[in-house]
Amino acid sequence: MDIKFEGNDAECTAGLKKASEGSFVLKDHVLIEFKINGKVAGKIKTPCEGVVTFGKGLKPGIVLNKGQVIATVSECTHAIVIKDMCATCGKDLREKGGRAGQRKEQSTANVSMIHHVPELIVSDTLAKEIGSADENNLITNRKLVLLVDLDQTIIHTSDKPMTVDTENHKDITKYNLHSRVYTTKLRPHTTEFLNKMSNMYEMHIVTYGQRQYAHRIAQILDPDARLFEQRILSRDELFSAQHKTNNLKALFPCGDNLVVIIDDRSDVWMYSEALIQIKPYRFFKEVGDINAPKNSKEQMPVQIEDDAHEDKVLEEIERVLTNIHDKYYEKHDLRGSEEVLLDVKEVIKEERHKVLDGCVIVFSGIVPMGEKLERTDIYRLCTQFGAVIVPDVTDDVTHVVGARYGTQKVYQANRLNKFVVTVQWVYACVEKWLKADENLFQLTKESTPPVGRPLGSKYVNDLANMDTIGKAALADMNNEVDEALSDDEDDGDNEDEDDDGNDVGEDKGDENLEEKQEKNEEEMDDVEQNGSVENQSGDALENETDSTSRGQKRKHCPEMEDEEEESDSDNEDDDTPMSYKALLSDSRKKGRIVPENEDDAVFDVDDEKGHAPANIDEEEDDEDNEDEEVPESDDDDEFEDMAALIERQISDAVDEKDQ
């Protein structure tokens, strides 16, 4: 509803406003006074309740004309809401008995702009007004925005019990939080880095640590609240448990054109072009990022880094960020004031691309087999920093990045006088944003594969350095496997029985004989009545031997038990060993691993036909048991001795009855 000035015969001027712009007023609330000859002559009141919006150009002292719109009173749109209560009109928007967010009335507020007060949300229109004012303020002060991660970027925190002399180590702080003792170590050069960056950047903390933890670290880094103030975004305010990018639109509703990020991990920022990824800082032994999101790729370090005290990463990053700031405002000054605001990501991309510009790189043994080159981090890093990746060594290639010496690509590169370097050369270029000296990272016969993943690369040492297998070696392996598969299936059973020694085997045999003797004595009564003692004993022995043989086969291959019970003839068809190619194909289909060394090749196969070669992984145990292995002939002798013993026992029993 528009409120207009009714006019007066005399000249009237506007007095002081009695309400603020955008405020909620009740009916008959005084909006403004008007004067005649410098004295208050009347007041203009609201005919209803609502939100006040004053007319343009209305200010004290101006002449009021009849019919002029003084203000507009409209219904509250609830543009500012905190905990489901409108901050403008004070109305409770939550349903009775409802949970947070369950409102009985619609609201235009949906943007959370305050770092540490996520419950305070504003409308899109108001958010853009605030964001635009913030941008103008930054440009006026010639600053950019810097989002700073905490853990393993500028600090390292441990929750392990330890004794630390904090008096002699001023950069180490111990404190209690959530009934636990934490120890935090500042990365070398952190204080100087933050102080210098504050002159060029408006700094914000963005961390996966909890709110109390984040604010406690901020007190350590910025005790006067001068660098970060209250611009602290913790896990409690983040919209996603896996990514930090979702909050950027809320924090910067007009766009992230001025935002630069430093973090030790790129995945949580979805590999944003605004990210300056830095080497993780690890000081405490066997402690990674205690606040890393679940299911993340973060890996625990095995040892404390020897150069933890000599870390100079922040000095390099300070140089990079200073250069980005200067380049941005150089380009900004050349643009017209009416043009769209320059995006700092364009400057970052351009400066990053200069590092390896002109480099044509071939990888040798770096990318694991079966993985697409374009999806690896080593490929992403090289291309981001300006290199071109090609598959083969040609005259245009400048570098071969290899994992081991002696490959064909390395040989070709040496023959063409190309740089042959280790993967550490790439990491050194990425970490410092400078092209490193190739002579310091030459790949030689003495070079060792890299340990760890400095910038989160998916470089897999074990798979990437598998030795190649020649045709002769494959032929030898084929023969060895065929011979192993052609051995009698009972060999494996003999090894299992003889592992405990011959004495144990004899004891078990005696126990079995006693049981059989008792059984045969019971059968003797029946046999004697039928008058066929000898035939019955022979049949019992034959059944016993056949049952023992079937038991051995079932023990060797349990999954064939049911089939063998149904038909013994099926086993005769299954005795044909698998060929080497079929065996290898079956192993690959079932996900079994073929190791890199020929001598250590393991084919852990237990196929449907019951063929199971000896496990070479247990080579040491097999060597110990070689002397105790029982040959096949011993099995036959054992059965013959057993049969003879049973016959003698039966014969003695018959003689005793006759007597």
Swiss-Prot record:
SUPFAM superfamilies: BRCT domain, HAD-like. Keywords: Differentiation, Hydrolase, Nucleus, Oogenesis, Protein phosphatase. Residues 139-303 form the FCP1 homology domain. Residues 351-443 form the BRCT domain. Residues 529-538 have a biased composition (Polar residues). Residues 484-640 are annotated as: Disordered. It is found in: Nucleus. PANTHER family: RNA POLYMERASE II CTD PHOSPHATASE, RNA POLYMERASE II SUBUNIT A C-TERMINAL DOMAIN PHOSPHATASE. This is RNA polymerase II subunit A C-terminal domain phosphatase. It comes from Caenorhabditis elegans.
